[in-house]
Amino acid sequence: MKKILIIGAGAMGAAFSIPLIDNNHKVFITEPYSQRFIKNLSSKNKFHSGLKINLSKKLIFKKYGKELFLEKYDLIVIALSLSGINFVSRELKKYKVKSPVLVLTKGLKYDKKNKKITTISQTLLKNIPKLNVSVLKGPCLAKELVRKSQTSVI
């Protein structure tokens, strides 16, 4: 059983927790932008309004903060919007996180200063050069993951 932290409790982060729990991993989920959202998700029925499902009772909700990064995880999954990548990158660097990172975020970033398009993994590695980072790409929608539909990812 691996200990996995998902940062981002939106549709894809929450949906990604399902196969992880199905494979008997200990899964934690947090939301840096909305404590109210994570509080609602951690209620008795664990209803996710975006996915229209009750999440697993085995899913463990954590308040976002410094204490979160003091724990050791076998994997950290980033499921934030593109705008959250720089924020979480600074947090991972600040707390000297050594866990491998899996990015679910779609998109490319435009570096205005260098007038260059970069991938999300390049953005993370720019801030944390020795970070062990992988990226999961679709086509795979959160609702397909919830329904356990066959999809393809690379």
Enumerate the predicted regions with their spans.
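Core active-site phosphate/anionic-ligand binding loop and the adjoining beta-turn-alpha structural block
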Residues: 152-154
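Rossmann-like NAD(P)(H) cofactor-binding subdomain of soluble oxidoreductases
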Residues: 65-66, 70-150
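NAD(P)+-binding Rossmann beta1-loop-alpha1 motif at the extreme N-terminus of oxidoreductases
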Residues: 1-54, 59-64, 70, 111
